[in-house]
Amino acid sequence: MNITVLAVGTKMPRWVDEAVAEYAKRFGRDVAYALKEIKPEKRGAGVNAAQGMAAEEKRILEAIPQGAFLVVLDERGKAPTSVELAEHLKTWQQNGEHVCFVIGGADGMTDRLKQQARIMMRLSSLTLPHGMVRVLLTEQLYRAASILHNHPYHRE
């Protein structure tokens, strides 16, 4: 199974990169995981939030793997349990889907991009820093995979 995470933003703290790498390597051969950073649009002098999101949308759309099952992370999305995420993962795996998760920029993402998503998901009702979202998403995807393999990582 292929999972791609597109995350607007670059230059994350080292602990973010290390944590994402740690969970990504735990997937093993069953999951090909890739995190791709999308350059954020600079705000200020003549570039407002809407213009910035539009520029980021263009970069995101160019980076989405062709035919991918698109999942966007948004505060208005549904917050699945770890077991529900595992069920999604199982379905995607059975259908041979290449799943692409999108983490928007500081101002979020355009409505047009959200409408293209097959699922809108949120990790928490709390506002989280972007680096933390990368880590939490990767950990939860690993947890979902471990649930499917009856690995003791997840405990009810």
Curated annotation (Swiss-Prot):
Positions annotated to bind S-adenosyl-L-methionine: L73, G104, L123, S124, S125, L126, T127, L128
Major localization listed first in the record, in broad terms: cytoplasm
Catalyses which reaction(s): pseudouridine(1915) in 23S rRNA + S-adenosyl-L-methionine = N(3)-methylpseudouridine(1915) in 23S rRNA + S-adenosyl-L-homocysteine + H(+)
GO CC annotation, single: cytoplasm
Signal peptide: none
EC number: 2.1.1.177
Database matches in InterPro entries: Alpha/beta_knot_MTases, RlmH-like, tRNA_m1G_MTases_N
Highest taxon, organism lineage: Bacteria
Keyword Cytoplasm: yes
GO molecular function terms noted in the UniProt entry: rRNA (pseudouridine-N3-)-methyltransferase activity
PANTHER family linked to this entry: METHYLTRANSFERASE (PTHR33603), RIBOSOMAL RNA LARGE SUBUNIT METHYLTRANSFERASE H (PTHR33603:SF1)
Function description: Specifically methylates the pseudouridine at position 1915 (m3Psi1915) in 23S rRNA.
Quaternary organization: Homodimer.
Official protein name in the record: Ribosomal RNA large subunit methyltransferase H
UniProt source species: Neisseria meningitidis serogroup C (strain 053442)
